[in-house]
Amino acid sequence: LNTIDEATKETISTPILHENIKALKELMTAIQTYISLEETREEHYPLKELNINTLCESIMEKAKINFKSGVEAVVNVPRVNIKTNAEELERILNHLLNNAAEYTKSGKISLEFKKRSAHTHQFILTDTGTGIPVEAREKLFKPFAEIRDLTQGNGLGLPTCSLIAYKLNGTLTLDTDYKKGTRFILELHV
């Protein structure tokens, strides 16, 4: 068993080493991003008028690459303009769509928009995936709280999205009443 020659050891260990270094770099970047957002929590992002239909269609189109075969992508976003920060809104929606893609084997992933009042808008991301266990919901937005044993994440994605939502004058919540998968609601006050 211990008779592997040095060349074979190097061949085996080099890809593993590179993969671990890459994972560490990604974790360090995620930690730095989270800390930076936390330190600037009260500094809200600059907002600009933009067409959210165009943005949401584009985000969904890119996200579909990660969808499993047979998963339907649905965008129900009207052609309206709202004041927001396109880059930061895209960061949140990309993360939510990537999570949905990872845990949805069949059915659909949908992104919709609802205007709740003149100054309150919701982006609702719904999937027919595995859902989030009741016991994990409490720690969902806490840093480093992995909720699945098989996840590839670092436990900072949803907490980071929650901070970004706050800096966009909004909130990110899990719809605990939805039982056919997972539904997140990003509510922005503009």
Identify the residue ranges that each predicted region occupies:
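Short alpha-helical segment of the dimerization/phosphotransfer core of two-component systems
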Residues: 19-27
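Short beta-strand/loop element within the Bergerat-fold HATPase_c
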Residues: 108-119
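Short conserved segment of the HATPase_c
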Residues: 132-144
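Short helix-loop "hinge" at the ATP-lid/N-box region of the Bergerat-fold HATPase_c
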Residues: 100-101
